[in-house]
Amino acid sequence: MSMIPISNRRRLSPGDRIWEPFELMNTFLDFPSPALFLSHHFPSLSREIFPQTSSSTVNTQLNWTETPTAHVFKAYLPGVDQDEVIAFVDEEGYLQICTGDNKFMSRFKLPNNALTDQVTAWMEDEFLVVFVEKDASSSPPQLPEIEENRNVRVVEITGDDD
């Protein structure tokens, strides 16, 4: 359990540090971090390797559901216009959804029963909906049949009724 001081000050001075009992067991306390080393000695290189992602990405949620007739992808893309979104299926069967300014990108390997030439996409409010048809001739996976004689033994439970 760790305790966090609550005060009006933003940072604690070194003398105000709270003692953490597990700090003594931390073997990586003096271990140099490559990110800190790069940012201190090579600031331009560290910006390329560790880009600031706070305002340059879209905070999105994506859902993939499978219905009996199609695969449906729904992505919440706040602040993204319909003209900025690109959705396509490549020759390897991957569905790629991205924005033109690369603030969002996601790839999905479509199953073999997906008809990659029958893909439709549209925007509803801030939601992108991608609809990929399924092959109707492919049957759903068969569940194993349950045997009627399963070697079941009935055990009588006896005891004292108090």
From Swiss-Prot:
Residue ranges of domain sHSP in the record: 53-149
Localization, UniProt: Cytoplasm
Any one GO BP annotation for this protein: response to oxidative stress
Domain of life of the organism encoding this protein: Eukaryota
Record's keyword terms, sorted: Cytoplasm, Stress response
GO cellular component: cytoplasm
PROSITE patterns for this protein: SHSP
Statement: the UniProt record of this protein carries the keyword Cytoplasm: yes
UniProt subunit comment: May form oligomeric structures.
Family affiliation: Belongs to the small heat shock protein (HSP20) family.
UniProt-listed PANTHER family: HEAT-SHOCK PROTEIN 20 FAMILY MEMBER
Protein name as it appears in the record: 18.5 kDa class IV heat shock protein
Species of provenance: Arabidopsis thaliana (Mouse-ear cress)
